[in-house]
């Protein structure tokens, strides 16, 4: 008796079952595809609830603290999910700030150094919020401001769409905001640390431009890429060569090409994570940030897939 051939939908589900603990993958995002494939596999092969339990250092938390507080202070609409949005909430500064800080403090610091940084960053965050709030308001003016709007795009023969959330958006423009958290350094010959402002870039970074390009292709609105720290900001708009339409489109399609390649590799391996791991470059354990502060589950997976033991 001839076995019934699997449908394309079944083949896709089987191949993508390597993600989210067997539950599969609904979509790609810029953040999930901006790193090497090995980094993607040791993160997104785990269930979301496991990923959310992992500890991370203060810098991402600083960005959330600043951006989320500013949004609560000045937004007209904030999307909480793809379909649920809010228009009314308590806009008291201290309450907005404290609620975000409480979310951060639900997780323990990574270590003593991170514990110091998490406390020390608070004064920097207050200053950064002031800078961010002003630059966004000056740019938005009287337009209705929508934050965290979900967007989705799918090109050519892509299997899964790319999704994202826009930081700040009006009828005519959008803003991709990048906070530059303060840096922390160890005091020589002491178990002490100091914190200082991080300088802003003089040119837009390619990874930030690529993320901006995705939102541009989704919205077709005037793009702004803004960097802020606790002292100042720098804005890149379409007057900058790298922010022009042609270059943003180029970066977007480079991202799409990468995703298409990944999808072909995933389909070829038919749900075999070990086989897929051998098709991509092994993790560079000396990379300055991709493989720092790994969870025990991630270290074990790296050893199982590539034979690399974490030191």
Tell me the role of every PLM-derived stretch.
Residues 151-211:
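Non-catalytic protein-protein interaction segments used by genome-maintenance enzymes to assemble
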Residues 65-68, 210-218:
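Short amphipathic alpha-helical face segments that pack within enzyme cores
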Residues 146, 169, 173-177, 223-227:
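A structural signal for short, well-ordered beta-strand segments and their strand-loop junctions
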Residues 72, 76, 181-183, 229-232:
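Short loop/turn segments at secondary-structure transitions that flank enzyme active sites
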Residues 44-49, 179, 231-236:
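Short acidic (Asp/Glu) and glycine-rich catalytic loops that position anionic groups and cofactors
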Residues 204, 217-311:
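Metal-dependent nuclease catalytic regions and adjoining charged, substrate-binding loops involved
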Residues 61, 65, 207-210, 257:
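Generic recognition of stable, solvent-exposed alpha-helical segments in well-folded globular domains
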Residues 1-165:
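Metal-dependent nuclease catalytic cores that hydrolyze phosphodiester bonds in DNA/RNA
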């Amino acid at each position: 008796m001839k076995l019934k051939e699997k449908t394309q939908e079944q083949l896709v589900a089987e191949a993508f079952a390597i993600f989210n603990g067997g539950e599969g993958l609904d979509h790609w995002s810029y953040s999930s595809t901006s790193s090497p494939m090995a980094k993607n596999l040791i993160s997104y092969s785990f269930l979301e609830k496991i990923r959310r339990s992992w500890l991370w250092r203060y810098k991402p938390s600083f960005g959330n603290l600043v951006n989320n507080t500013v949004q609560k202070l000045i937004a007209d609409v904030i999307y909480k999910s793809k379909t649920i949005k809010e228009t009314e909430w308590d806009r008291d500064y201290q309450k907005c700030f404290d609620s975000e800080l409480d979310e951060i403090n639900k997780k323990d610091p990574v270590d003593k150094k991170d514990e110091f940084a998490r406390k020390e960053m608070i004064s920097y965050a207050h200053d950064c919020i002031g800078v961010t709030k002003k630059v966004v308001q000056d740019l938005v003016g009287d337009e209705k401001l929508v934050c965290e709007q979900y967007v989705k795009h799918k090109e050519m023969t892509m299997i899964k769409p790319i999704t994202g959330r826009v930081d700040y958006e009006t009828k005519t423009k959008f803003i991709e905001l990048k906070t530059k958290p303060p840096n922390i350094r160890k005091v020589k010959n002491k178990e002490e640390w100091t914190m200082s402002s991080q300088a802003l870039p003089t040119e837009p970074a390619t990874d930030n431009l690529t993320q901006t390009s995705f939102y541009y292709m989704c919205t077709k609105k005037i793009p702004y890429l803004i960097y802020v720290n606790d002292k100042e900001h720098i804005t890149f708009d379409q007057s900058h060569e790298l922010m022009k339409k042609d270059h943003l489109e180029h970066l977007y399609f480079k991202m799409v090409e990468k995703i298409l390649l990944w999808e072909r590799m995933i389909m070829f391996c038919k749900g075999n994570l070990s086989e897929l791991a051998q098709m991509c470059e092994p993790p560079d354990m000396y990379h300055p940030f991709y493989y720092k502060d790994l969870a025990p589950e991630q270290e074990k997976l790296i050893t199982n897939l590539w034979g690399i033991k974490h030191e």
